[in-house]
Amino acid sequence: MEEAYRQARKRGEQGRRRAISQSEHPYLTDLDSLVAQLPLGQRENVGLRDIPLEMVVGTVTKGRQSAFSCNFMPLLPFNTEFARKWSNLYDIQVTEGYRDPVIVTEFMHRFYVQEGNKRVSVLKFLDAPTVSAKVTRLYPGTWDSLESRLYGEFCAFWRVCPLYEIEFSREGSYETLAKMLGQNLIEKWPQKKVDYLRHTFLLFKRAYLRAGGDHLDITPADAMLVYLNVYNQDRLLDTPTDIVVNRLCKIWRELVIAGKNDEDKVDLVEAPSVDEEESPAKSTSGVLNFFMGKTVYSAANPLRIAFIHEFPCATSSWDSLHDQGRQYLDEHFGGIVRTEAFEDCHDPDVFYAAVETAVKHGDKVIFSTSHRLMEYTLRAAVEYPQVRFLNCSIGLPHQSVRSYFGKMYEAKFLLGALAASMADNHRIGYHASVFASGALSEINTFAIGASLLDPRAQIILTWGDVPARGLAEAMCREGVSVMTGADMSKSLEDPTAYGLHRLIDGKVAGIAMPVWNWGRYYELIVRSLLHGTWDETSDDSRVRAVNYWYGMSSGVIDIRYAPGLPYQTRKLVQLLRNGIVEGSINPFGGELHSQDGVVQIEGFPPLPSTQIVEMDWLADNVVGTIPQTDDEPKVRAL
């Protein structure tokens, strides 16, 4: 049809000019040129498939390259044989449809046409979603680039769930999606599950594009993972499109963050502002007068804060410590701040009920005190944007929820030095219960601290949930006389293995332990709210997550000695502690060695904080390994 070809050619010219103006290739990409200098792997006959037309991006050979614009629209004049054939194919398609499939080569999750370029062009002009094709898959020759690794993950996904439409830009996403649906990447999925995912994704994609998702730097599949992480209890197929669009608008900043590079996702706030450091308790005029004129809150109009704990405070030392911090706020701020606590909220329904109650009570800030509550906290934050939510974790890139945690590695550095000063045979035990963000930095600073006092020190590393007495016996068999285990216990007289302790004749004798001062931490955060500096922490023009990461210099972390520790030893540790607080000592500055070689050479500045949080190596004097994530999934936050 003459008019159809003219319209298609017009779109082709527009696409060609747009590409030239943006310094892009104006014609179809040809696969032969694309792979000419690349190492290639084997070819695999995939067979007859319906493939997404939006993923058909080029031709196999150069022969037809200049006949089409980069958007697959025709460019040749109307009075040509090419134009007549294109028009005939158009007439066939609109009257009866094609019967024969095109022939394509798949390379890196894109398709290049061997036979049927004009048919593909006609279908794209008609906005058809798919085309029937005989597919040959061409594998890359190496798998060391991000793109090839992502393609390898896609191929593993495709073998169990043959959907081309699902494309991720982050490693590990296919496995995450499979787990969300109760599947894996090893066993073939039931056809009902494949069909469900296809229909769900297409519904979500329409809503995502309607909400303006094509302006974001993520794929629709990336966005669907973010959506499901917040609204994972809802079946998308049963949700009206208008509601999905509305929800996408609510989590828009989460979607923006998902498109950023890892180093651009999180702002680590490592020290409080000057205003936050000022202590109202030291004011001679009293707490109320100290804040007079500095805050909109008063005893008559207090800042109301809720704390949501995972377990009962009577049975969980972690939750009990946080609740002591909550009680400190009530006492410290003299009526300007009023708090309430909700315990045993590990069940999602109980958690959401607690949030609803807190909002009804007028609470403007909600702390959830366990990283395992982050999923629930994120969804609640999206539903109640007028409330400020914080979760006790580190390294999680959520703009709707701020995270807070402490630089425990500083305390572990001191404990490592202390351990080396008291070990009899250069062998020191270290037990970590969970593989978490920050765990490796704590192990490594412990090892570095030990090596400062004893260059021959070896850190015997074990992982997992092991009974304290069984762990002590196992360490004794390894010749370990000094070790560090769990960080918390109700008292130093507790006979279980906690903190740094000696192993003597099968018994435990405490040496020192790390200490959390959650009252101080909550005081610093709340003071930013009272002073009105909360919003100054992050620049609204840059959508980033905010993670508070305070350390010894802020008074939120310290160590406590057992009674009877020699004063010479305490003096040594105090010197190192002063260096940490003053900033003259950084365990991760200068020369660093891992089990695999040199991390950085002498004279180098300290590692950036983001590298410390996401550390993925062990110091050279650590005897042990990092758990395999397939066997023991890494917890993303402490």
Set out the residue ranges of the language-model regions:
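An alpha-beta-alpha
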Residues: 326, 414-457, 542-563
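Hydrophobic alpha-helical segments within soluble ligand-binding/sensing domains
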Residues: 404-426, 515-536
